[in-house]
UniProtKB/Swiss-Prot annotation:
Region feature (Regulatory domain): 391-509
Residues reported in the UniProt entry to bind Mn(2+): 14, 202, 204, 238
Record lineage: Bacteria, Bacillati, Bacillota, Bacilli, Bacillales
Swiss-Prot/TrEMBL GO biological process terms: L-leucine biosynthetic process
Main location per the UniProt record: cytoplasm
Name recorded for this polypeptide: 2-isopropylmalate synthase
Top-level taxon in the UniProt lineage: Bacteria
Domain Pyruvate carboxyltransferase intervals: 5-267
EC number: 2.3.3.13
PROSITE patterns, A to Z: PYR_CT
Pfam families documented for this protein: HCS_D2, HMGL-like, LeuA_dimer
Function statement: Catalyzes the condensation of the acetyl group of acetyl-CoA with 3-methyl-2-oxobutanoate (2-ketoisovalerate) to form 3-carboxy-3-hydroxy-4-methylpentanoate (2-isopropylmalate).
UniProt keyword Amino-acid biosynthesis, yes or no: yes
Organism: Staphylococcus aureus (strain NCTC 8325 / PS 47)
Keywords, in A-Z order: Amino-acid biosynthesis, Branched-chain amino acid biosynthesis, Cytoplasm, Leucine biosynthesis, Manganese, Metal-binding, Transferase
Length: 509
């Protein structure tokens, strides 16, 4: 019988530390709900003491989820622990995650503390946390660069103080699989407790070994894996949870362990994170990439047609990828469109479907057929516009002279107020973005601008992702439209809208 491996998702905390990623309040809540639907055991919803926004989003998630444990991060500071308590006290299963660095380089250069000081801090703060929480998780930051004898002392101190979950972070992605497994074996053999202790792995991908190290940790005695959807995170990212879960599923013969994830929700979860993070999943990404179940070679195609297992070790359906797509066209009616939405896993009320159907018909008039990816894109674009504080109303462009373009942009807020301005620039995009900046009265720096086609062909919809720097803060925006310039404007307006929402500001004019 397979043993249960718990999944601890830190997409909303460690994942959001990805450069350029800044989830809105609504996006965090939607992500948490999808993670619960996916079946993760614990969601690290944020770092409540770090900001008012983080506190409020953790609190909202704690009050919304019904089955998943909600965890908040805390340094070895009582005020941090208090913040987690206040944010998660209404959760069905509240958890606090207390951490302190333990490696020589961190003690000397960051904390300016001795080993004795660190041990005393662990004892004091884990003891305090245990007075407020039934479940306390402790992490010795940079554990894999900590001397093993001292690491054992740190963990034993935390366990004696009441921690029942011990997480071993490979903070800078430094370890390799045998070494990492050995750390877990040493801890499970050396640390004593009258309580059951769950050991957890938290791996970063700086050397490309986050997933393999996570699996090695299981062989060493870990019973929980921490990571993020799509592997997003600081620097090179974290262990991709979908890869860990499918590795355990497919190679159960070796690991003898399984997660409780609803694997059919995997692709949907990945797509949601990709959309909100503004990070496109690479086509060749394991499990959820567009090419994960594609076969180009004639030999491979022949083999798959004869027997799928010749070149596929898992089915697309296992992770929620449909292989029987029936495209819609301009003659398709409301009923067919509604049935397509259900088939794609969407539960959308009739009123919202009316607007989506209008968008579908507009696209169907321009394309020979509308694919599932087009439908997903319509819904994604609609969600973004519905959630936004401001959205693009109209865009007009005119050629001036000598390469200069003129743009007139009209933006509408949720209350129906209209804001309009115009500008010129050396090209359409520059003119559009100058006009939007004038509307919001902000000086911005465009850090990244990316265009992707939703499907193949010249009639494909365009997805535009932008990253802006506004008053020292990075925000991302997403826009989708058949017209690249419209999509570009929508993305830029959304980025400004996110900044305005986070700062509770109103634009002028």
């Amino acid at each position: 019988m397979s043993s249960h491996i718990q999944i601890f998702d830190t997409t909303l905390r460690d994942g959001e530390q990805t450069p350029g990623v800044n989830f809105t309040f609504d996006e965090r809540l939607r992500i948490a709900l999808q993670l619960e639907k996916w079946g993760v055991d614990v969601i690290e919803a944020g770092f409540p003491a770090s900001s008012t926004g983080s506190f409020k989003s953790v609190q909202a998630i704690a009050q919304t989820l019904t089955t998943t444990a909600v965890c908040g991060l805390a340094r070895c500071k009582k005020s941090d622990i208090d913040a987690v308590y206040e944010a998660t006290k209404d959760a069905a299963k509240p958890v606090v995650h207390v951490f302190i660095a333990t490696s020589p380089i961190h003690l000397e250069h960051k904390l300016k503390m001795s080993q004795e000081d660190v041990l005393a801090s662990i004892k004091e703060h884990v003891t305090y946390a245990k007075q407020l929480f039934d479940v306390v998780q402790f992490s010795p930051e940079d554990a894999t660069r900590t001397e093993l004898p001292f690491l054992v002392k740190c963990v034993q101190t935390a366990v004696d103080a009441g921690a029942t979950v011990i997480n071993i972070p490979d903070t800078v992605g430094y370890s390799y699989h045998d070494e990492y497994a050995h750390i877990f074996k040493t801890l499970t053999e050396s640390v004593t407790s009258s309580n059951e202790i769950i050991y957890s792995a938290h791996c970063h991908d700086d050397l490309g070994m986050a997933v393999s190290n996570s699996l090695a940790a299981i062989e060493g005695g870990a019973r929980r894996i921490e990571g993020t959807v799509n592997g997003i995170g600081e620097r090179a990212g974290n262990a991709a949870l979908e890869e860990v879960a499918l590795a355990l599923y497919v190679r159960n013969d070796h690991y003898g362990a399984q997660t409780a994830l609803n694997l059919e929700e995997t692709k949907k979860t990945s797509d949601l994170i990709s959309r909100y993070a503004g990070i496109r999943v690479p086509r060749n990404k394991a499990i959820v990439g567009q090419n994960a179940f594609s076969h180009e070679s004639g030999i491979h195609q022949d083999g798959v047609l004869k027997h799928r297992e010749t070149y596929e070790i898992m089915t697309p359906q296992l992770v929620g990828v449909s292989t029987t797509e029936l495209p819609l066209g301009k003659l398709s009616g409301k009923h067919a469109f509604s049935e397509k939405l259900k088939a794609l896993g969407y539960d959308i009320d009739k009123e919202a479907q009316i607007d989506l159907f209008k968008q579908f018909k507009a696209i169907a008039d321009k394309k020979k057929s509308v694919s599932d990816r087009d439908i997903h894109a319509i819904i994604q674009g609609s969600e973004h516009e519905h959630q936004a504080l401001y959205k693009l109303e109209t865009l007009q462009l005119q050629y001036v002279s000598s390469g200069l373009q003129s743009a007139v942009v009209v933006v509408k807020d949720k209350e129906g107020h209209i804001y309009q301005d115009s500008s010129i620039g050396t090209g359409s995009i520059v003119a559009i973005y100058n006009a939007v900046d004038r509307i919001f009265q902000k000086e911005t720096e465009l850090i990244d601008y990316r265009i992707n086609s939703v499907t193949e062909g010249t009639d494909a919809q365009a997805e535009v992702h932008v990253n802006l720097l506004i008053e020292g803060k990075t925000v991302n925006g997403f826009g989708i439209d058949h017209d690249i310039l419209q999509a570009s404007c929508k993305a830029y307006v959304e980025a400004h809208a996110k900044f305005a929402a986070e700062n509770v500001e109103k634009v002028g004019n």
